[in-house]
């Protein structure tokens, strides 16, 4: 029998579990969940020194597509000419603008602008805790279910490509890879958890948000 995330013997209804965990949640305090727990005191001190004192509010849409074979995560590959996170795997999103009523409105707007995802296909479920990024943003992840049948229209100035990853793959700890990367100035390195998928590598804040969802739906459930 596989572990709970693999779930071949006893398939998990991830949709129902996500609804149970996130329904009616609101944006909340920041976490730095893309780091591997158990960071040394030296690494923790260096890590904290990299963050801005007043990060810019931003939001991303975490789109979970309801495919017949199970939920998938819709991800983007950012355009290579962007100033921040160029070429990286990410969720559609960006800074919260003055005209946005809240993080949800910002995430929906950005998803439409970046990849043409029509709001009519989207049902927002709730929020993961904010993630503070070294690039200077405090990001609110807005988790949603997306009905199939949508057509995407990519803004080539921001998005190079889109693809989907099965949520069961993301939730399988066999696919989580701990790696060390250098951040900021000097020689200090920090441990992060990547999620390689085919010829793509999901890492940094995007992997961190997915791992936050994994811990909420898999690890916390197992502890109960």
Q: Where is each model-derived feature located?
A:
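N-terminal leader/linker segments that precede catalytic domains of diphosphate-processing enzymes
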Residues: 1-90, 95-113, 117-140, 145-149, ...
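NUDIX/MutT-family hydrolases
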Residues: 154-198
């Amino acid at each position: 029998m596989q572990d709970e995330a693999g779930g071949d013997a006893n398939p998990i209804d991830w949709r129902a579990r996500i609804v149970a965990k996130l329904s009616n949640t609101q944006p909340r305090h920041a976490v730095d969940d893309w780091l591997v727990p158990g960071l040394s005191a030296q690494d923790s001190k260096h890590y904290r020194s990299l963050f801005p004192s007043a990060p810019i509010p931003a939001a991303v849409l975490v789109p979970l597509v309801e495919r017949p074979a199970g939920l998938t995560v819709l991800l983007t590959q950012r355009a290579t000419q962007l100033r921040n996170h160029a070429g990286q795997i990410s969720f559609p999103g960006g800074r919260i603008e003055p005209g946005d009523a809240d993080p949800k409105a910002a995430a929906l707007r950005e998803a439409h602008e970046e990849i043409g995802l029509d709001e009519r296909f989207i049902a927002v479920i709730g929020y993961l805790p904010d993630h503070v990024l070294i690039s200077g943003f405090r990001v609110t992840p807005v988790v949603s279910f997306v009905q199939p049948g949508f057509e995407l229209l990519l803004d080539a100035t921001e998005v190079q490509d889109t693809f989907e990853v099965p949520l069961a793959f993301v939730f399988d700890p066999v696919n989580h890879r701990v790696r060390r990367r250098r951040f900021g100035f000097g020689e200090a390195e920090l441990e992060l958890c990547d999620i390689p998928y085919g010829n793509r590598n999901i890492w940094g804040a995007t992997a961190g948000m997915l791992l936050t969802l994994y811990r909420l739906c898999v690890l916390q459930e197992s502890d109960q």
